[in-house]
């Protein structure tokens, strides 16, 4: 795919939990708990205008779902601030210092005074109905690893409550995560290829982690990706779970937008401008149906209704992403706005047990050959689903609607909610502005001294190539490497890195279980000069449970020969094959048991 010709633009929003002693707006500890909660409270959210007198479209969408929210908490680690029963405390200075330090890393412009804002969030993940956020800096730019990274904004905000599950129409959240400090770094639009965007995301995340002030583990970093192509629209894709998925998400979203533009072009060619909301009860067409899907609804007292989609013949089944069609997009809308499980459309029928005769019967009843079938018991839900479908059909001739979408595990995306409007953000009335003091700046400057480029320089100064140093930094083994450097001082840094990055990975691909204990035992044997570096892979491959590297080497006949033994062997081999071929021949005959440096030294001494 020629992304330049497509006019691909991407943006990143990287959210990283900070490792602080308290939450951002209260003094509760920022810990997640799995034990039984001490209490539960129930809340409902209601729509109202913001302090600016406007209503956000995303709010309208969420409130119409009429959900109840249940919050679980602990008396010793959650408080009234999380329950929105007490005003927020002043922001945590430790978190603010980290945000200022990150701003300095990216040469962003700091605000002298920071205002706490309320960002409307009505999916229940914030008890108050809004998330408190502070814009710390803007307009940053840094060149790191050859990438020119423009940073639009750096914000400090509170994380949302943790979703634990659903109970019917109620969503259950746990308050332990609510209020944990979160730094959000939003980039300027980029024209990099998808693979390069993944690299940029890693650079940003690592730049925060290297300060030692970021939390580690699953769920501590979240990536949102904004994607658009020429003629398309900005689409925000929430919750890309893994950096490696970013290229696929971008590729598939570009494909989706291109497909939607082609559908729009075809609709214009067909003269389709507007679809009228027309709902026809076609239950009788399925009176004798053998379709299990339809029969289940009818047996429950439900009915089947058809929504006319004139002009959409063969377009409802058009693929927009791998395994997803335009009809899937419509089904996403239905699932998002109602409790219905989805829909069927004429391009996929006959199918699902529905016969050609039943399809012809429906066509006769609605008067068109392209239609949407909705099934359910609740008439209100069916009417709402029909309205949503028609709205999305009417958006199709305009191309790509602005949406917030969610990432699927395979890199495709699904509709989540409409894009929020400007009415989403307004000032926090319970807190005064926060000044960036000289003390905060001084502390932040110290934190900002630790950089990615600085870490790479430190590693290359130890003898690692830049490529190997970068591999190590990108791996989860950097802390182990630094620990092993101190513990196994006789093992060259390059050898430690090779064991962690290359040998362990190659053996794991063979199905060999590699544990920290095995690696440490092998490095200890190397450190004591019990084995050679050539024997490492074979020893690791064949170590039995509970066996040390030295014991395994002895069993395998791979204990390192003493220097006197090596010298004797070198003299014998050199006499047989000559001085020039002696090193290679000794290594061939005794590989794994002799160290090449010992062989060279012995040869040099013999022929002095």
Swiss-Prot record:
Assembly and binders: Heterodimer of GatD and GatE.
Source organism per UniProt: Pyrobaculum arsenaticum (strain DSM 13514 / JCM 11321 / PZ6)
Uppermost EC category: ligase
Family: Belongs to the GatB/GatE family. GatE subfamily.
Enzyme Commission number(s) from the entry: 6.3.5.-
Cellular component, GO annotation: cytoplasm
Region (Disordered): 401-428
Keywords: ATP-binding, Ligase, Nucleotide-binding, Protein biosynthesis
PROSITE patterns: GATB
Role according to the record: Allows the formation of correctly charged Gln-tRNA(Gln) through the transamidation of misacylated Glu-tRNA(Gln) in organisms which lack glutaminyl-tRNA synthetase. The reaction takes place in the presence of glutamine and ATP through an activated gamma-phospho-Glu-tRNA(Gln). The GatDE system is specific for glutamate and does not act on aspartate.
Record-linked InterPro entries: Asn/Gln-tRNA_amidoTrfase_suB/E (IPR017959), Asn/Gln-tRNA_Trfase_suB/E_cat (IPR006075), Asn/Gln_amidotransferase (IPR018027), Asn/Gln_tRNA_amidoTrase-B-like (IPR003789), GAD-like_sf (IPR004115), GAD_dom (IPR029351), GatB_C_1 (IPR042114), GatE (IPR004414)
Catalytic activity: L-glutamyl-tRNA(Gln) + L-glutamine + ATP + H2O = L-glutaminyl-tRNA(Gln) + L-glutamate + ADP + phosphate + H(+)
Disulfide links within the chain: none
SMART domains: GatB_Yqey
Protein name: Glutamyl-tRNA(Gln) amidotransferase subunit E
